[in-house]
Design a protein with these regions (language model features):
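Preference for long, amphipathic alpha-helical scaffolds in soluble/luminal domains
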Residues: 3-442
Length: 442
């Protein structure tokens, strides 16, 4: 029989988690270093790589982390409005989330002054998107960091606006993104194709949502070998993969299609009742379903190396109302049943943060809880075991209780298993939400 954590212990852990998040929320802005309202997150290299240096770790301010924590806390509050300590945290972080926006679009990073001169000759007085503290050396990598706005952060950022209006009222002048923003960048009738999608994903002209909001380079007649040649000479200006000064960069000069990004977009569209209006939603459902049937779990998400991030993202989109994911959800249930360890944990590939067991278990547990919310049959003993495992992983330092951050994002493609983003606050928020949902199924 699975060990069952008492409800009082679960409630205490939720309270401790919220206290930790309250105490760890940043109160002071140091421009270019840290920002009031955010939580600590880290951008780190696990091994040496060209242009990015050796093993290192730097604090990083980014939209994904801040909007992610905001949305978790907002969902928790709407599920239990007695949790009033959440409200000040939301009010403090929300302006910080908006700082990553340009109109209705969002970027992973803020616009900041360049770290160095980015081209020969006179420099324009212009800001660029870049990490806050990570040391980028040389013009090439600094120009490459100036990435375009993207569908992932735009979905998360607009979901934060949706939650803010839901909780605090609709008196603010902010307009939520409509489906056209996402439908303007679909994987159809293209004259280019990302090498990672070609090698590992297949499904050409899927019609699903592409990641980057920008004009990719085009070939008159695309061929993988042409694309590969350009990627091999990425450091030369003649390559489509070469980043140019002060121009928003799409990595490798080619847009990509990521299953987790698509699930995140579907969550926002479903929450805001825009899914039916979106041209890409049905194809996004099919794209995710095809990938899930294929079952290449370790290479599923371009930017998401954790094996169970897909399960979490899809289950959340289903719970948000996207019934087009029901077939995929059934496949995910089968995979979750097959891969849970005896102690209740789940694990990713060894190269991912030494199996990334805590983060994998948090994602898998939330996936099961979301799926159960959506009416799927999930044996409660499986959830009991996972909750018990998560409960035992909590840490206490300086009278604070938290869960150690695992991998929730990466640099993608060639640095997918090297350049990681982690945050104790993000993982602690995930576990707190899992505990809250668990109390409803006890």
């Amino acid at each position: 029989m699975a060990q069952i954590v008492p409800s009082d212990s679960i409630r205490k852990s939720i309270a401790e988690s919220l206290t930790y998040l309250t105490e760890k929320q940043c109160t002071e802005t140091i421009v270019g270093k840290q920002y009031a309202g955010e939580w600590e997150a880290y951008m780190q290299m696990k091994a040496a790589f060209l242009y990015l240096g050796g093993r290192n770790q730097y604090r990083d301010s980014n939209c994904f982390t801040m909007a992610g924590i905001h949305n978790i806390l907002a969902e928790m509050y709407l599920a239990d409005t007695s949790q009033k300590q959440i409200l000040p945290m939301l009010q403090k972080v929300f302006p910080e989330v908006l700082s990553y926006s340009t109109g209705s679009q969002f970027n992973f990073w803020k616009k900041l002054p360049p770290n160095q001169d980015l081209k020969w000759g006179k420099e324009p007085i212009e800001l660029v998107h870049r990490p806050t503290n990570f040391r980028l050396k040389g013009r090439f990598i600094n120009n490459a960091a100036n990435v375009a706005n993207d569908a992932d952060d735009t979905a998360l950022g607009n979901l934060a606006i949706w939650y803010n209006q839901k909780i605090f009222g609709k008196n603010d002048p902010l307009k939520l993104a409509n489906s056209v923003i996402f439908d303007s960048f679909l994987d159809e009738n293209r004259k280019n194709r990302h090498w990672y999608n070609h090698l590992f994903h297949g499904f050409k002209n899927s019609g699903a949502y592409m990641t980057w909001f920008g004009q990719e380079n085009e070939f008159e007649n695309w061929h993988f070998y042409k694309n590969a040649l350009h990627n091999l000479i990425f450091f030369l200006p003649i390559s489509i993969a070469y980043p140019h000064p002060y121009k928003a960069y799409i990595p490798w000069g080619t847009n990509d299609i990521d299953v987790v990004v698509n699930a995140n977009v579907l969550t926002y569209l479903s929450k805001n009742n825009l899914r039916q209006a979106s041209k890409g939603s049905t194809d996004a459902n099919l794209f995710i379903e095809k990938h899930t049937k294929r079952g290449r779990w370790n290479r599923m998400g371009i930017y998401y190396p954790n094996r169970y991030h897909l399960h979490f993202a899809v289950a959340r989109a289903l719970a948000a109302g996207d019934t087009g994911l029901l077939k995929t959800a059934q496949l995910l249930v089968q995979h979750l049943l097959k891969t849970q360890n005896q102690d209740g944990s789940f694990e990713s590939k060894k190269i991912v943060n030494k199996h990334d067991i805590l983060q994998s278990t948090a994602y898998a547990t939330l996936a099961m809880l979301y799926l159960k919310e959506s009416g799927m049959e999930i044996d409660k003993t499986l959830i009991d075991k996972s909750i018990a495992f998560l409960y035992l992983q909590k840490k206490e330092e300086n009278k604070q209780v938290f869960w150690k951050g695992g991998v929730y994002f990466s640099g993608g493609t060639v640095v997918r298993n090297m350049l990681y983003f982690t945050s104790d606050a993000y993982t602690t928020a995930l576990v707190a939400m899992a505990f809250q949902k668990y109390l409803k199924v006890k």
